[in-house]
Amino acid sequence: MDIISVALKRHSTKAFDASKKLTPEQAEQIKTLLQYSPSSTNSQPWHFIVASTEEGKARVAKSAAGNYVFNERKMLDASHVVVFCAKTAMDDVWLKLVVDQEDADGRFATPEAKAANDKGRKFFADMHRKDLHDDAEWMAKQVYLNVGNFLLGVAALGLDAVPIEGFDAAILDAEFGLKEKGYTSLVVVPVGHHSVEDFNATLPKSRLPQNITLTEV
């Protein structure tokens, strides 16, 4: 299936079939998608919680209480549930972790190339954390890049998913001790196979026309 067909076919799943699980291979593939998403300057300011056990999914679903109870069954019935978390502050320890990993992966021919790469990343990191004072917002944007990449990727694997912002982040952060670890939850994405109750699976896709959303120059 070509990428345009995938984009046209995927939809936000409103109900999952709890009896259908990801295969072990698919479970590994979705983790690879998370790992290899693009991010600004390859900063990767994220962490993911992947819940596949009933206990794990129930812990995530605690955040779908009160005003968000309509999302609870999605979290409980999906095969896997991914919590996308962003770093709350960019620090030099993380930047060193990134450049050292790039070095270990063979991206630099010389020490000078590594130093230049590190300097360039720190320029943008410092611009956001010291000049614009919006590093938290900048890092959240990178996580959303990952979410978009992930949604298209899981659809290409023949899986169904739905991005959820309707959850109590304070409850979820507390449940997993995210604040203490320097993260906060942004998006929850259940993944699995839609059920016959998923009304959205049979509805036509609707988007604004290109003459409204696109300008060619």
Curated annotation (Swiss-Prot):
Cofactor: FMN
Positions that bind FMN: 10-14, 71, 165-166, 205-207
Regulation of its activity: Subject to competitive inhibition by dicoumarol, nicotinic acid and acetate with respect to NADH. Subject to uncompetitive inhibition by dicoumarol, nicotinic acid and acetate with respect to nitrofurazone and nitrofurantoin.
Alphabetized Pfam families for the sequence: Nitroreductase
Signal peptide residue numbers: none
Domain of life: Bacteria
Family: Belongs to the nitroreductase family.
NCBIfam families tied to this protein: PRK11053.1
Residues annotated as transmembrane: none
Record-level GO BP terms: 2,4,6-trinitrotoluene catabolic process
Protein name according to UniProt: Oxygen-insensitive NAD(P)H nitroreductase
Organism: Escherichia coli (strain K12)
GO CC terms in record: cytosol; membrane
Complexes and interactors: Homodimer.
Documented EC number(s): 1.-.-.-, 1.5.1.34
Keyword NAD: yes
Functional note: Reduction of a variety of nitroaromatic compounds using NADH (and to lesser extent NADPH) as source of reducing equivalents; two electrons are transferred. Capable of reducing nitrofurazone, quinones and the anti-tumor agent CB1954 (5-(aziridin-1-yl)-2,4-dinitrobenzamide). The reduction of CB1954 results in the generation of cytotoxic species.
Stored InterPro entries: NfsB-like, Nitroreductase, Nitroreductase-like, Nitroreductase/BluB
Gene3D superfamilies, A to Z: NADH Oxidase
Keywords: Flavoprotein, FMN, NAD, NADP, Oxidoreductase
Known catalytic reactions: 5,6,7,8-tetrahydropteridine + NAD(+) = 6,7-dihydropteridine + NADH + H(+); 5,6,7,8-tetrahydropteridine + NADP(+) = 6,7-dihydropteridine + NADPH + H(+)
Recorded GO MF terms: 6,7-dihydropteridine reductase activity; FMN binding; identical protein binding; NAD(P)H dehydrogenase (quinone) activity; oxidoreductase activity; protein homodimerization activity
UniProt-annotated binding residues for NAD(+): 14, 41, 71, 74, 107
